[in-house]
Amino acid sequence: MSASSSRLLFDCGSLDWPNKSLFGDPTTRDVMNEHISSTWNAVIRRHMLAPNANAETILGRDGLPSAQFDAYGAMLPSFIQALNAPTTRLRISAPLSTAESILCADASHAPWLYMANSVCAYEATHLQPVQTFIAFNFAHGYCYLSLFIPLSFRITFENARGFSRFLEQLPDILGAYPTLAAIYKTMLFAIRLFPEVLQAPIPIIAKRPGVLQFHVSDARGLPPSWFPMKCGSVASFVALITNNLNSDLLNGIVGSNGDGEHYTNWNSGHDHWIVNRFITVKDLHSSLKSALEVDLDTEGGRNAVLDLLLDLGVTNLVRREKRFPAYFQGAESVYLLLSCERVGNELVAVQDALQEPLANYSGLDLRALIINLGGLPSRHSDICYTRNIFENDNHLVWNFEFYRIASITKNAQIDRDVLSSSMANLFSDFVSESSNGQYRVKEPRPVVQYRVEHDEPVASSAPSAWWQVLIGITTAILGAIIFFLWRCFLRAKRVKFQAKDSFPWFTTSGDDDSPPPPGDSPSRPPGRSPDRVLPRTVVRDLSFNDDDDLHSVDLNEAGSRFGEVVSLIARGNLRELAGAIPESLSNLTLLQTSASGSGFYTMVALYLATLGDAITAFHEHNDASPATIQSLRTLELQLEARGLRFNEAGTPANLIQRGVNSSVGRALVRLTQSALLATGENFRTRMATTLERIAAERLNTLTAYDQRVIEMTTELLAAIKPVLEVERSELTPHLANAEALLQVYNNLFSTDYVSASLLALRREMILRSAEGRVGEQPTSASDAANEELVQRSMTKLDKEIELFQAQIDSQRRAVTITEASNLRENILQPINTVANIAMAGAFLRGGARHRMPGMPDVATPMPNPFRAFSGRGHSLTTTRSGGLFRRPRV
């Protein structure tokens, strides 16, 4: 806080200060423009907190309360209780970490900031009131709108309409729960368009201690012990963030905490998709092809085919935290819903035929039925899904991709058209390959080729063909000459080096410095130092030459160690890469300085540096930030386009992402939270379930983080179990041990879990102790005073119990939160990175070679025909459900 932070709002020496206006004399008070005021009315109607909603808490994106307002209101409810309140508890503070002190300050010396009022909000540096709305509160996730209320009073008449359009777009673009970095970029944009808002005050932006969660304050004050940011105006906010752009606090969420990827509007109505069974068309045809190779005239062969049909498909394909897969191999990789009743009836018919006696159905009859199953996708194309179709039909939006909302419907319709025209061809190919021409299906309709039609001007007469040929030959010759001269120019700029047998130490030809003696190496390579730290950035910030690729690299010049780096990347073993990255970075730094094709070396070095950070974060915390994964994927696309091969099982970025999604430790931490919130028999049941899960996971290969979670969870549950079983006389040491272990658990895994059972026992002990003291007969004036103190303690404990019960009730009510408040989040993802990925994907798919507008139509080549057994089918689960497709016999 600055030195002026202790200055009070009003002059206590003036006797008429209670009658003063908070915003000055009404004749000089700022008035909001009419257009801006009407825009705010529309925004308020859409994003205000419902009148019947609980305004005393902050709800996170999980629907659970994360903070409580008006701490002093509960401590000082009346004049008498205010005088009796312990002095040591009147300052609400929390330790300020070094990372938090960069942007935040301790404001525990200003208790009025934490008090709710019906008058105003405060700004941080001078602790003065700011103009804001006090008749209502914004909905959860939209508290950042309070930042733009004081700006509305500073807008000039000329910019009023432009600022109104800016306000209309603000909630739709940022959505609910944006990041602090997104708010910073929005403020920069507002300053560029409306420079008059530069000195406008803003309400306090408060940070939750130890958690990447922010809240823009209003008349309810700050949550207890939260830290205000060290800025009180638009200019100071922008300057503060600009000076600390490398801080991890910029990834914090305004209004909530956590940044996991999930479907933002997933609700209980979508839970049935978790247990529904899907199968790709490719896997379906491969499985049926295998069934046709079995001898169906024997009992054993029919049982084998029956088992195969019962195991068709996978479950758990999609859920709230798991996105529906995208397909990249063509229409045969779309997903067919097997849990549909129509598909189930056909499968049950084949199943019943397989269970009939051998005399009723011959092998040829069964083969015909099995081949007919291959036409399920063509007969039921309406239940074939791609990612676009699934998300459009269920109105689901994946967070970080709100920019795709407008294109999901269009892409889904295109996918539907392609599938309806392609499935018949796939079925025809399957029948011809599986039956050797014995069975035939009707001729499928041709696949529609989608292209953009352009209006061509009507020519009066056809040009001469020989004239066009002559122009084409002349253009080709001129292009070849220009290309040859350009290559010669590039080669003339390159410096020649002498290659060594081992990793090279290069010197430029014609240099005045004498080369080092044979067998020795210079103290350092020319140019930059080998231990220089590579910049952390994304590919869009670099300018690479298209000629700098793996094919243009001279491996003899680069040395054997660079070849080892290339082979390590191709193998994709994360542990080998983690050990080899530090040495490889120093070698690549030298190559960037001295060898030809330095652009490619720079790209590989940047990729290895980013990958090393991601591997370290994954091994330590089983986590990797979305920005790091996005940068890795961008770099992998660039490297793959330049000839570097990756493992077919998945790139390192994919392996890290899969490891994060399937983290055993994080799943156990969430399971432990569920157990701790339960009481009585529910707690014992969930504790037993958690221990069974731990016992099952110990048999698998685990990371160090998973082992640490398993050990701490086992110790915590083992400490809580005797607390629920011992006698009340022996409860105190066990309860203290369990509470201490729970605190250690929270510190280790950055959680704030509480145990409902432990809290109930602790409060029961306090009540019993107080009741015992009340039952004693007072023998003196001191005993009478003690009895009065006990009565006050009882009253205080009753209020604490009521507050605790209110928190429990608010957690239960929070489950019914509307999906509108959680629809949009994190809208301002790095747009340039997404554009780079899209461009790279377009070039890799040959997008640059497509027909350009104005060129004559050319025949589009037909796709390669489907080949059975071209690859092994991939299954998410191996769970067998014998009665999945069985229906009861009548």
Swiss-Prot record:
InterPro entries: HC-pro (IPR001456), HC_PRO_CPD_dom (IPR031159), HC_PRO_CPD_sf (IPR042308), TMV-like_coat (IPR001337), TMV-like_coat_sf (IPR036417). The record marks G255, S256 as: Cleavage. Residues 788-816 form a coiled coil. Gene3D superfamilies: Helper component proteinase (3.90.70.150), Tobacco mosaic virus-like, coat protein (1.20.120.70). GO terms for biological process: proteolysis. One of its GO terms (molecular function) is cysteine-type endopeptidase activity. This is Genome polyprotein 2. It comes from Barley yellow mosaic virus (isolate China/Yancheng/1998) (BaYMV).
